[in-house]
Amino acid sequence: MIKKKFYIENYGCQMNISDSEIVSSILNNKGFIKTENLKEANIILINTCSIRDKSEKKILLRINQIKFIIKKNNDILIGILGCMAYKFKNIKEKKLINLVVGPDSYREIPNLINNFFKKKGEYISTSFSKTETYADIIPKREEKKITAFVTIMRGCDNMCTFCVVPFTRGREKSRDPYSIIKECKFLFKKGYKEIILLGQNVDSYLWYGGGLKKKFKIKEIKNEEIINFSKLLELVAISVPLMRIRFCTSNPNDMSDNVLNVIKKYINICKHIHLPVQSGSNRILSLMNRKHTCEDYILLINKIKNIIPNCSLSCDIITGFCNENENDHNETLNLMNYVKYNFSYMFIYSHRIGTYAYKKLIDNVSLSTKKRRLTEIINLQKTHSYYRNRKYIGSIQDILIEGISTKNINFFYGRNSGNDIVIFPKKNYKIGDFIKVKINNCTSATLVGDIYV
């Protein structure tokens, strides 16, 4: 029997990249062969993102393109994985696809694929699991990479009114910490230089033996048996002292002093925190069901700067949320002016089916107003990024070389501890080397320097 080939196309966040690596491992172990060529695949899997309307439209367009490429070949399976799976539960209404699998059901993919080719059984699985973290699966990663994603938890309990994640990925469940440590050590032996610990809300990580976090009862277990994020972060730092460690994403409501002190203590933990604020308006934060106020957020920012003075800060900002007015928008700009983030991810709000905002709030800010406000936010962030980057000029930064610059093949690019991109002449080094670079120039997006010997 000829072994079937599968092709995976990935959209969305770093978690989706990690999930695609898990799916590749599951399929490889069942005898399927991965290909990077869509046209030679029997199985085409699209790992989807539904965080914004624009993402979904892009994916649906891509599926139509794939259908055109394969024509009417009924022997090719097209499957949807990830966050859009919940939208395709009634597969009979969607002639574009043959298979639908949600984030907690990836172990079932081989059987579902076999069902399709045998023309029997089910081609869909979107149920949530109370325990699934794929802790026993070593992801099938691309060769010659130096950075690896390590998922430490799945799902989210925060129920922000704008966010679809609890409905697409389920509730919070944390992975066995000892499987995380084992994977990190494995990656070090394989030659990886950096790991990124992933979760929808890493600071909410809590291991007490497994299961949903919302089922946890503090009185039923000894405190020393509990491993929270600060303890996990320290365990990882100690276990792989020669690897760089990053993590994302954090929620301001859950970040503790203990986490900050661990970041400060260990040199191999990068001095960068991604701390989404979403809005600088308390009124909008309340409508979003964020558990922090603007004042809480500023106190946390001040604490970070006090404990880790050179810590780089980034955030997510949503503009044009339901009922947002000019005063709310200006308060967001004011917060940005106070923090002066190194960089930010900035988006226009779009209604997500299934969320509280979709059901109960009106998306009443015009698109033109959203676009204008987003432009103002982006322009201000560019000013702040340039301001932050200027401060690096004259300094010597420890850089991990990540690749060749896309703008000049004679230059490498890499990142410092603060996650800032740095470009510099190649010389006699290679991708994966740690080097020192003296910064002599910058733009709002990039630091420019020379190798310092």
From Swiss-Prot:
Binding sites annotated in the UniProt record for [4Fe-4S] cluster 1: 13, 49, 83
Lineage of origin: Bacteria, Pseudomonadati, Bacteroidota, Flavobacteriia, Flavobacteriales
Keyword Translocase: no
Cofactors that this protein relies on: [4Fe-4S] cluster
Subunit composition and interactions: Monomer.
EC number: 2.8.4.3
SMART domains tied to this protein: Elp3
Disulfide bonds listed in the record: none
Species whose genome carries this gene: Karelsulcia muelleri (strain GWSS) (Sulcia muelleri)
Protein name (Swiss-Prot/TrEMBL): tRNA-2-methylthio-N(6)-dimethylallyladenosine synthase
